[in-house]
Amino acid sequence: MKMHQIPTPTMSQVIMLNDSITTAEFMVSALRDFFDKPLEEAQKLMLSIHRDGDGVCGVYPYEIAIYKAVCVRDKARARFPLRLMVQEVK
């Protein structure tokens, strides 16, 4: 039987950026709904993003990171200017 080398996926982090319009409640909701953060962790991360200007929501294979970022952007688009970045982990 021939063995195939399966490539390791490129890992990427999803980074949420702070802004002055998106509510804390929306950010916590997005962190819980799309990044599976427990309430307390989501609240701490939201405060960190507010204080530091950005924060890492999670690290995923590239395609999953893009999907999660797009889902959050789509949910935010109607009411908030929330921005997310996907950045390769080196």
Swiss-Prot record:
Would you say which domain of life the source belongs to?
Bacteria
Q: Which Gene3D superfamilies match?
A: 3.30.1390.10
Cystine residue pairs: none
Concerning InterPro entries, the annotation shows:
ClpS (IPR022935), ClpS_core (IPR003769), Ribosomal_bL12_C/ClpS-like (IPR014719)
Q: SUPFAM superfamilies from the entry?
A: ClpS-like
Cite a single GO BP annotation.
protein catabolic process
- Output the Pfam families linked to this UniProt entry: ClpS (PF02617)
Q: How does this chain assemble? A: Binds to the N-terminal domain of the chaperone ClpA.
- What is the purpose of this protein? Involved in the modulation of the specificity of the ClpAP-mediated ATP-dependent protein degradation.
**Entry similarity comment:** Belongs to the ClpS family.
Record-given protein name: ATP-dependent Clp protease adapter protein ClpS
Q: Which gene encodes it?
A: clpS
